[in-house]
Structures are given as structure tokens and as C-alpha cells.
């Protein structure tokens, strides 16, 4: 257990991972979703907390957008994505009257909901809780880190794309982690090359190696590259499990490798 005190609704959660990105559109929610699915295939019980309040996309990625959140004595009961109840999900997307409603809130109201999400969701026993955060470094990130600090999170996973502008934003994310005392468990480079669906050749549309070079210079682990893969996009659009439905996907081995490294890091703490 990572918690050092009675954690209330988080007392049964063994490892907490925050997924961060310096800018929007780098596939942070995609990586959060795929790692959660891969952890489930490794026999782990996983929760996903979607605190990207203005862009809650994970319910759709897991084909759970039509499900409802219920109340219990301990607070909110998360939505279970599968029949085995091995993946549970909480998102503001479940609390909106209409899926297309915009969240037009000022900072204090957002921060209050984040704190409520951290304290009032009845997760039960989980091996991993993955927290999908908004892009950038804002009030919401500070509120999330502060609310989780008593529970000693495993650390932050930083997602970037190969372009220099994205890598530069991740540098600021590294500074944020350092200032808030949040351990960085690794960097993932997403959209790293395009895999042709016909010949499976990988072409570097943007560039390559920016995330790995940043990890080397910063002294943090580089967990791997995930290519642009039409099958990965298809699985997310259809709300399907990539590893189950598309085992020949080019992204499959990359996601599997990243997940194995996370499991290896977590095992000494279990």
C-alpha cells in the first residue's frame, strides 16, 4: 500500500498514477485508456478518474457514455465498464444533462469538484487508479496533486508527441512535477510514426525521438513510443478493447511494453 493514513474511499487503492501532458491533442486520454485496458489484461483491477472537466472523452472511448452514476453511503459509485467490474470509471461526463453540454465554470467550482472526486468516489479495492488530467499546468492540476498528496501517489506519466513544440511543453510539465514534489515515472512519446494499414511500414510524419531525448536529458525513464495506428483510432471510436479486438495492431506491443514497465515499477511497492 502507498497510503500512509486512513484514506477513506482511497484506502483500498494500491497505486495512483496521474497522466499529464503539456498541451492538448497529444493523446493523453488515449494513453490513459489503453494502459487501463492493458492492466486489466494483466489481471489487475483498475479505476480511471477523468478530471479533464472541459473535455471528458474517456466515457466514449470505453463505450460507457450512456451509463449512470449512482449514490451510496460512501458517495458516488463509479461506472463499471465491463461485466467483471475490473475497470471502474468516474467522469464529469456522467453528470452532465446532455453529452454536448459545455462545462463553463470558474476555477473555484472546478477545484471543488476535483476534491469531491478524490474523496467521494467509492472505488473499493483497486490495484491501480489512473487519473486523466487536463492539458497544461493549471489550478486544476494543483488541486488534484494537493488532494492526492496524503495518499502518496506512485507518480506522473507524461505524454508528448515528437514535435519540438510538444516536447517543450513537457519540459514545463517536468518543472511542475519538481515544484509539487510529484515523482515522474516516465515519458511516453505518442503518435511516433504512422503505420501503413496495407504494408505495415512505419513513416515518421512529424519527427522522432524528441520524447526519448528529453527523458535522457532530464534523467527520467523513457517508457516507449506509440505509433499512429488506424486500428487504435478505430478501437477508440467504437469503444472496443484494442488488445482484445485488434491483437495485430502496431500499437499493441508498444502499449504492452509500457504497461509491463509500470507493473515492474509498482511491484516493489506492493
From Swiss-Prot:
Disulphide bond pairs: none
Key words, A-Z: 4Fe-4S, ATP-binding, Cytoplasm, Iron, Iron-sulfur, Metal-binding, Nucleotide-binding
Binding, [4Fe-4S] cluster: 196, 199
Annotated compartments: Cytoplasm
Cofactor note: Binds 4 [4Fe-4S] clusters per heterotetramer. Contains two stable clusters in the N-termini of nubp1 and two labile, bridging clusters between subunits of the nubp1-nubp2 heterotetramer.
Source organism superkingdom: Eukaryota
GO cellular component: cytosol
4Fe-4S as UniProt keyword: yes
MF GO annotations: 4 iron, 4 sulfur cluster binding; ATP binding; ATP-dependent FeS chaperone activity; iron-sulfur cluster binding; metal ion binding
Major location (coarse): cytoplasm
Cofactor(s) for this UniProt protein: [4Fe-4S] cluster
Pfam families found in the cross-reference section: ParA
GO biological process: iron-sulfur cluster assembly
Binding-site residues, ATP: 22-29
Chain's role: Component of the cytosolic iron-sulfur (Fe/S) protein assembly (CIA) machinery. Required for maturation of extramitochondrial Fe-S proteins. The nubp1-nubp2 heterotetramer forms a Fe-S scaffold complex, mediating the de novo assembly of an Fe-S cluster and its transfer to target apoproteins.
HAMAP family according to UniProt: Mrp_NBP35, NUBP2
Similarity comment: family membership: Belongs to the Mrp/NBP35 ATP-binding proteins family. NUBP2/CFD1 subfamily.
Subunit text: Heterotetramer of 2 nubp1 and 2 nubp2 chains.
Name of this protein: Cytosolic Fe-S cluster assembly factor nubp2
Amino acid at each position: 500500500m502507498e497510503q500512509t493514513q486512513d484514506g477513506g474511499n482511497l484506502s483500498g487503492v494500491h497505486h495512483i498514477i496521474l497522466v499529464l501532458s503539456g498541451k492538448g491533442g497529444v493523446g493523453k486520454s488515449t494513453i490513459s485508456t489503453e494502459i487501463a485496458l492493458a492492466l486489466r489484461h494483466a489481471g489487475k483491477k483498475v479505476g480511471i478518474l477523468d478530471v479533464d472537466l472541459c473535455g471528458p472523452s474517456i466515457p466514449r472511448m470505453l463505450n460507457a457514455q450512456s451509463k449512470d452514476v449512482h449514490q451510496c453511503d460512501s458517495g458516488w459509485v463509479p461506472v463499471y465498464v465491463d461485466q467483471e467490474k475490473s475497470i471502474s470509471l468516474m467522469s464529469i461526463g456522467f453528470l452532465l444533462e446532455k453529452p454536448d453540454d459545455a462545462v463553463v465554470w470558474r476555477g473555484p467550482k472546478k477545484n471543488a469538484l476535483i476534491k469531491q472526486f478524490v474523496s467521494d468516489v467509492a472505488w473499493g479495492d483497486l490495484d491501480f487508479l489512473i487519473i486523466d488530467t487536463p492539458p497544461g499546468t493549471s489550478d486544476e492540476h494543483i488541486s488534484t496533486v494537493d488532494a492526492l498528496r496524503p495518499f502518496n501517489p506512485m507518480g506522473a506519466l507524461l505524454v508528448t508527441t515528437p514535435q519540438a513544440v510538444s516536447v517543450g511543453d513537457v519540459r514545463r510539465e517536468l518543472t511542475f512535477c519538481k515544484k509539487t514534489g510529484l515523482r515522474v515515472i516516465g515519458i511516453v512519446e505518442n503518435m511516433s510514426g504512422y503505420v501503413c494499414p496495407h504494408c505495415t511500414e512505419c513513416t515518421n510524419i512529424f519527427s522522432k525521438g524528441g520524447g526519448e531525448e528529453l527523458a535522457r536529458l532530464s534523467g527520467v525513464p523513457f517508457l516507449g513510443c506509440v505509433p499512429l495506428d488506424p486500428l487504435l483510432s478505430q478501437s477508440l471510436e467504437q469503444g472496443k478493447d484494442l488488445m482484445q479486438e485488434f491483437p495485430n495492431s502496431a500499437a499493441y506491443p508498444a502499449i504492452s511494453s509500457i504497461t509491463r514497465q509500470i507493473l515492474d515499477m509498482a511491484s516493489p511497492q506492493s
